[in-house]
Each structure stands twice: as structure tokens, then as C-alpha cells.
A protein has these predicted regions:
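N-terminal Rossmann NAD(P)H-binding glycine-rich loop of SDR-like oxidoreductase domains
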Residues: 5-19
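Short beta-strand element of Class I
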Residues: 28-30
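Helix N-cap at the beta1-alpha1 junction of Rossmann-like dinucleotide-binding domains, i.e.
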Residues: 35-37
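Short, conserved SAM-binding/catalytic segment
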Residues: 42-51
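Rossmann-fold NAD(P)-binding glycine/threonine-rich loop
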Residues: 101-141
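C-terminal catalytic/substrate-binding lobe primarily of soluble NAD(P)-dependent oxidoreductases
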Residues: 163-412
Length: 412
């Protein structure tokens, strides 16, 4: 098969490419980006004769369509909603099966901070999402939507937990990419950039939907902070998590849930710092005037803080997950927990975030190309990886030294 990666010069795109070129049934891997030098840098690092470089502005729809005709599956690793939607829209029109790792659920785009997302004139966001789904069905396209770490692994494990129960009542996903403990102490907010930080701040600020008492309700991001101790995989760390706009597909694909939320994991102190920044207005987008110059407080903050959050020499990251599903099985209450603790591959120079995100997207593309995932339209991970494919997915993760621990506990 031939697989085309959009955003091929970024860290996530590079990780996807590194994984794909090692598969015997992958003949070529195309890298798409606007900067030829950046693409060459990725190609040199991947170091495979299977790599093909394509310098292209993805906003050029006709050129993108023409390129897509030479490939079997596409992977979007782009860092914002404007480019993400453009690529998947174009792929659907071109009849190309596509995997996207950024957006949580294209069929129901959240209305906050749309990041330049362009939709057909006269359509609401929800109408656009439904239109994309119907177009994909009409074009016989599989659009695997939100496949990485979170969304992605988190959706797949929570979906499996729900399937294992006769009746699932509550699901909480706790996921996040954090610096190693040593690196956290060297950075403000005990945080280090492993993902597009402007997009991270967006997810701290918007309002989002969760399920409470069986109803969809809107809450503030960064709320309901919860502390916990992570003791699996030989760890013994105190962490915190707060609600963020992750995995909203469950509001629609698993409406039987009485409670549902996704929370982002951070080191203690991070969420208190974010709360302070929110309270003083530093994360606002409304411009303020400073010495005759208008600038959004968040843009100013990004300019100041991003350099201080970049990894220093020797810094590594960790990805952590603790997902919980509760409900009944054979008339008795049960809790099912899923755990992950993944560290960076320092030998290869691949961050943990790139491993769990990029490798998951690569597996998704491979499963489509191999005919394992056949559902058409917009397909969220919890539906794409059903009971049969769930074990196959875990096996593929294990081949990449990523382990998921499942624990089932009767409750009384």
C-alpha cells in the first residue's frame, strides 16, 4: 500500500513515517509539507528508500486532489483545525481513505475558537459535520476520526470497557503528556511542549459538553481538578487532572452513559497556574492595547512562555493514562480500569507523545489499508476498533513496546 502523510515535516508526521516504512506491505510513504528543507530533514531522519517528498500547500485543493490519486490511505498530522478540516474535506472529495489525529470528532465540531476552520457558505458547523459524513459515505471513504493518544487509545480502551459490561453507567478518561519528573522541575507550570501549545491553551479555555446525570451539559475547560496517585508499571507518582474537550464522540456514540468526561493529566501545580492565568485574563483572545499596539493576551503569553517550555538538552516526556468505566455485569457492579505509562525512546529520539500518538495513527492507517477497518463515513476510534480488532490493536502496540494494563474489579 501507499500512504500519504500531511504534516510530514512535524514531529508527529515523522513518527508516523518512521513506523510505516518498516511495514513489509507498505510500498511508499509520501510526506506533504510547504517547506522542502523541512521535508528533507524528516526524510534524512527516517532514512528509507520508501519515502517520497511532496512540496505542496494543502489549501490548494486541486493540487492536493491530484496528489491523493497516487495513494491508498492518507494520514493528517496537522496542528490546527483550519488545515485539518481542509485536508479531510479534500480527501473525501478525492475518494481517499483518511486518518486524522487532531480533531476530537469532525461530525460534531465544537463551536469555540474554530482556528480558521472554513465551511461551505450557509452551513452551520453541525450541518458541515453531517455533510462530511454523508459525503464520505457517498464516496465510499473510511474517515478514521481522532486516532492518536487522546483521542485515540483513550477512546479505544474506554469503548472496550463499555463493551465488557452489560450496562455501562460512568466513564472517565484521564490522559496526558507530561515532562519526566526531572524535566518538570526545570520548566514553568511544570510543563514542557510536546504538542502544538496554542492548541493546548485553546483546550484549557473553551466550554465543552460532558454527560452528567444522563444529560449533556456544558462546563468550563480546566474545571473539576482531581488529584490521584498512579502506582502501575512500577510508578508511584501523585498527579492531577482537569476536564478538557476530549473524546466528545462518546456523547453521541455511547448515549447510554449517565456520566462521561475526559480529563487531562498534569503534574501537581500546573492546573493552579493555569487557573491564575485564566483569572487575570492572560489566556483571553480579545486584544488589549499596549503602548499603542493591540495584541491578544494569549498571543503575548505564547510569545513569552513558549521558549521557556521547549525541551532542554536531556529532557524527556511521559504519557500517562488511567481510564475508568463502571457499570453492571451479570447483575453485579464492576469497575474496569485501563492504565498506560509510556516513556520517550531516547535511543531513537522519539518522544513518548510522538510514540503513542504517531504510532496509533500509523496502526489505524495500516488497518484501513489491510482491509481490517471497513466502516465508511466518519468513524470514531471506539467504533472502528470493535471487540475483534481491539486485541489486534493492543498486539500492534505491544510490538512497539507500548503496553495497556486492564484491571476488572467487582464492587460489592
Amino acid at each position: 500500500m501507499n500512504i500519504l502523510i500531511f504534516g510530514g515535516s512535524g514531529k508527529m508526521g515523522a513518527a508516523v513515517a518512521w513506523d510505516l516504512v518498516k511495514q513489509a506491505d507498505v510500498e511508499s510513504v509520501g510526506l506533504v509539507g510547504r517547506n522542502e528543507d523541512s521535508l528533507k530533514k524528516t526524510a534524512n531522519w527516517v532514512n528509507s528508500s520508501k519515502i517520497r517528498l511532496h512540496t505542496l500547500d494543502i489549501m490548494d485543493v486541486e493540487a492536493s486532489k491530484a496528489l491523493m490519486e497516487a495513494y491508498d490511505v492518507g494520514v493528517s498530522t496537522l496542528p490546527d483545525r483550519r488545515t485539518s478540516y481542509r485536508v479531510v474535506d479534500t480527501a473525501i472529495q478525492a475518494g481517499l481513505d483518511i486518518v486524522d489525529m487532531l480533531e476530537e470528532y469532525h461530525r460534531r465540531p465544537d463551536p469555540y475558537e474554530v482556528e480558521g476552520l472554513e465551511k461551505p457558505e450557509g452551513m452551520s458547523l453541525n450541518e458541515y459535520g453531517d455533510w462530511l459524513h454523508e459525503e464520505a459515505l457517498a464516496k465510499n471513504v473510511t474517515f478514521l476520526d481522532g486516532i492518536g493518544f487522546a483521542p485515540g487509545i483513550s477512546n479505544i480502551t474506554v469503548g472496550e470497557g463499555i463493551r465488557k459490561l452489560d450496562q455501562a453507567d460512568c466513564a472517565v478518561a484521564r490522559v496526558g503528556g507530561i515532562p519526566s519528573k526531572e524535566a518538570a522541575d526545570r520548566h514553568p507550570l511544570r510543563y514542557m511542549i510536546t504538542w502544538a501549545f496554542d492548541h493546548v491553551l485553546r483546550e484549557y479555555m473553551i466550554r465543552l459538553n460532558v454527560i452528567k446525570d444522563g444529560k449533556i451539559v456544558e462546563v468550563d475547560a480546566s474545571s473539576e481538578c482531581e488529584g490521584f496517585k498512579f502506582t502501575k508499571f512500577g510508578q508511584n507518582e501523585v498527579l492531577e487532572c482537569a476536564i478538557t474537550p476530549g473524546m466528545p464522540s462518546f456523547l453521541y456514540t455511547r448515549p447510554e452513559l449517565q456520566e462521561f468526561a475526559e480529563k487531562t493529566v498534569r503534574w501537581p501545580g500546573h492546573w493552579e497556574g493555569i487557573k491564575t492565568l485564566k483569572e487575570i485574563g492572560m489566556l483571553d483572545l480579545e486584544p488589549v492595547e499596549i503602548q499603542g499596539i493591540k495584541i491578544a493576551p494569549r498571543d503575548f503569553l505564547l510569545a513569552v512562555i513558549e521558549p521557556k517550555l521547549q525541551p532542554l538538552e536531556g529532557d524527556t516526556d511521559v504519557c500517562v493514562m488511567w481510564n475508568t468505566v463502571t457499570g453492571t455485569k451479570d447483575g453485579k457492579k464492576h469497575r474496569i480500569d485501563y492504565y498506560l505509562w509510556d516513556e520517550a525512546d531516547t535511543e531513537l529520539g522519539i518522544s513518548s507523545m510522538a510514540r503513542v500518538t504517531g504510532f496509533s495513527a500509523a496502526i489505524g492507517a495500516l488497518f484501513i489499508g489491510r482491509g481490517k477497518i471497513t466502516k465508511k463515513g466518519i468513524v470514531p476510534p471506539e467504533d472502528a476498533f470493535d471487540s475483534e480488532l481491539y486485541e489486534d490493536f493492543l498486539d500492534e502496540l505491544e510490538l512497539r513496546n507500548i503496553s495497556i494494563l486492564e484491571e476488572i474489579t467487582p464492587l460489592g
